[in-house]
Regions:
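N-terminal Lys/Arg-rich, disordered targeting/topogenic segments
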Residues: 1-9
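Compositionally biased, low-complexity segments of secreted and virulence-associated proteins
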Residues: 10-13, 101-147, 161-162, 168, ...
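Alpha-helical transmembrane signal-anchor/signal-peptide segments
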Residues: 32-53, 183-186
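Conserved small-residue packing positions in alpha-helical repeats and bundles
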Residues: 55-59
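Short, charge-rich amphipathic alpha-helical segments embedded
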Residues: 74-93
Length: 357
């Protein structure tokens, strides 16, 4: 009867199997497409299929110069050339003096009033809303509406309270909550300027209705509102931070988009996103396309979010295939080694039986 293989030889066999598995895994890994490359390719293919110069002409016909600029930027990204008449119209609409006058007025309105009718205004408005003053101003505006026979907007009031609570929480969170505050500032300006998708606004409203207790807030008197420290304290204490977490998470993504790209891109996200999940997906788009993300969303709409999700699912599916292939490879190598050892034993036993006694 043959002796079993020594431990050193068995260890050598396992090492050989592991080396083969690692080499196979490396080969499969580098053959996998990266999410960024897949997302970029999918977006560009979709732009080439759906974006036409006529869309830019229609935007100019409607007086939407900002939208026409975004579409032209997306066309440039996809390598779509513009006919000379369209390019000339866009150039004329973007003449320096027209844009300077319009954007300066919109910026002033956004900074002072907190509302905006254009992309320049929202940038200035968000900058103003990044302070306690902006949130207290908006809360005061809403809380004094009943004196004018108007109904307060609970969405704006809730976002103002959330912004204050996130700023108050900044020291305890090491400043990380300020990114979420940036996102809530963008959302608040988008709501005031009617630049937010209805489904997204409804989801945000649902979260705020459970996270913000408006009873104590609505009970504030005029003197309370005039005292900024007291008003800030009352508004901040009205927020349940745990229930606000889903909005804060998406707000963080929106705040990062604002920093990585610009206010125009963040605005396009609020106008296009169907849910807070779409807002978080938009952060991946912004990481790849930067300031051109706004043009992608203007041209493709919510389809851009679906393309990102599809590309990520494909990568995860291929990763699962990789893990399965590695497991199969290791199992096959171990089984092959066992078969070889068995054959060797049988051959040795056969040879020993054939030897004369």
């Amino acid at each position: 009867m043959t002796e079993p293989a020594p431990p050193s030889r068995r260890r050598l066999g396992w090492k050989a199997a592991l080396v083969c598995a690692v080499l196979g895994g490396i080969t499969l890994y580098f053959s996998l497409p990266t999410p960024e490359r897949d997302i970029r390719q999918a977006i560009i293919v979709a732009l080439r299929a759906e974006l036409t110069p006529a869309m830019i002409d229609r935007a100019l016909d409607d007086g939407d110069v900002d939208g026409a600029e975004l579409l032209a930027d997306a066309a440039d990204l996809a390598g779509i050339g513009l006919p000379k008449p369209t390019a000339d119209r866009l150039r004329a609409a973007n003449s320096l003096w027209k844009q300077a006058l319009g954007k300066t007025a919109d910026c002033a309105k956004g900074a002072v009033m907190g509302t905006a009718s254009g992309l320049a205004g929202i940038v200035c408005s968000v900058a103003a809303d990044m302070t306690l003053l902006g949130d207290v101003r908006d809360a005061t505006t809403e809380l004094t509406k009943p004196l004018r026979g108007e109904e307060p907007d609970s969405l704006i009031l809730g976002l103002a309270a959330a912004g204050i609570a996130l700023e108050v929480a900044a020291p305890a969170t090491g400043g990380s909550s300020m990114a979420a505050k940036g996102g809530t500032a963008v959302l608040k300006v988008a709501v005031k300027s009617r630049m937010i998708a209805r489904r997204l606004a409804d989801e945000i409203g649902g979260i705020l209705s459970s996270a913000v207790h408006l009873g104590p807030v609505k009970a504030m008197s005029a003197s309370d509102l005039a005292d900024m420290p007291r008003a800030s304290r009352t508004l901040g204490n009205a927020v349940d931070m745990k229930r606000l977490a889903p909005l804060a998470e998406a707000g963080t993504s929106l705040g990062r988009i604002y920093k990585k790209a610009d206010g125009a891109t963040a605005l396009m996200v609020t106008r296009t996103a169907r849910s807070l999940d779409d807002v978080k997906t938009a952060e991946k788009l912004a990481a790849i396309f930067g300031k051109r993300t706004g043009g992608v969303l203007k041209a493709l709409g919510a389809k851009a979010f679906d393309l990102v999700v599809l590309a990520l699912r494909l990568v995860w599916a291929l990763l699962g295939l990789l893990i399965g292939a590695l497991c199969w490879l290791v199992s096959a190598l171990v089984a092959l080694r066992g078969m070889i050892r068995l054959i060797r034993r049988l051959l040795r036993r056969s040879a020993s039986l054939e030897q004369p006694a």
